[in-house]
Structure formats: structure tokens, C-alpha cells
Design a protein with these regions (language model features):
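Hot-dog-fold acyl-thioester-processing enzymes
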Residues: 1-87, 150-154
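HotDog/MaoC-like acyl-thioester-processing domains
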Residues: 1-6, 94-154
Length: 154
């Protein structure tokens, strides 16, 4: 079944907030094998001008799992069959580093749904903001729904 094109342009309101902790950042840095001291040592981060440890840029992917319940892909009316979905790509535009102590929330928008051969490509844009409204990052994620494009008459 094709993905519901009526979702293109649909906005999803701010999610519940998530407080970023030092341990969240440290665990992620260890998991990806990045030894940057600014990710684990507050003194090293402060020496670089940050208020606390900072997160690796790709840390924001973990927030997608926390914010996911408010996302378009959780909406049954979208018609997305998770058993057919693979991750396409992820892009990050960081407006400032994510720091321990940040309280973040996100809004999402379905930017595009289109056929690519027998598959469908869905692009979602997420705006991540701090509690004070400061824009932290803009992410763009694409997912591929395999074999669900509308069949074309030959």
C-alpha cells in the first residue's frame, strides 16, 4: 500500500522535552568510539568555551527515538509498514553544540513523499530547540519504503 501523500507538508507540534545529561553524551561518545575529551570531560569542554560537555553531532539521532512517538511515522493514517522500511540518509545542520543540561524539544514536518522506482522515499525535517526557544539543530531524515510505490500501468 502506498504512503498517504496527504501527509506532505503536515507539521507535528513540539514534542515532550528531554534533558540531556552528561552520561547520555558520554555513553554515546563511547559507543561510537570518539575519544574527544570535550564529550566526556567538563574541564576540556569549558576550555573550548562551552558551559559543559558537548555531544557529538550525530547524538541527535538518539533523540529521534525519544521524540518518535510524536512523529509522523507513528501515525497509522500514514500507511507506513515498518517491516518494509529502511533508513535512507540523515543530515544535520547544527546551529550550536548540544550541551549537557540542555532541555530539548522538537517539531517535525513531512517535507516530501515520492516514488523512486518501485519504492517510496519519505523525507522528514526536524527542528530541535532548547527550552528558551533557541534553535539548536535542523535535521533531515529520509526513509525508504520498499516496494510500496503505486503500480504504474504499462
Amino acid at each position: 500500500m502506498p504512503i498517504n501523500r496527504e501527509f506532505i507538508g503536515r507539521d507535528y507540534p513540539a514534542s515532550e522535552t528531554f534533558e540531556v545529561g552528561r552520561e547520555h553524551i558520554r555513553s554515546f561518545a563511547v559507543a561510537i568510539g570518539d575519544p574527544n575529551p570535550a564529550y566526556v570531560d567538563p574541564a576540556a569542554a569549558r576550555a573550548l568555551g562551552h558551559p559543559d560537555v558537548i555531544a557529538p553531532p550525530t547524538f541527535l539521532t538518539t533523540l529521534g527515538f525519544r521524540f518518535g512517538l510524536d512523529s509522523p511515522v507513528a501515525d497509522a493514517a500514514l500507511g507506513l509498514d515498518y517491516s518494509l522500511v529502511v533508513h535512507g540518509e540523515q543530515q544535520f545542520e547544527l546551529h550550536r553544540p548540544v550541551c549537557a543540561g540542555d532541555v530539548l524539544s522538537s517539531t517535525q514536518r513531512v517535507e516530501q513523499i515520492k516514488d523512486v522506482g518501485r519504492n517510496e522515499l519519505m523525507v522528514m525535517v526536524t527542528e530541535v530547540t532548547a527550552a528558551d526557544g533557541e534553535k539548536v539543530a535542523t535535521t533531515r531524515m529520509s526513509i525508504v519504503s520498499r516496494g510500496t510505490a503505486a503500480k504504474k500501468d504499462a
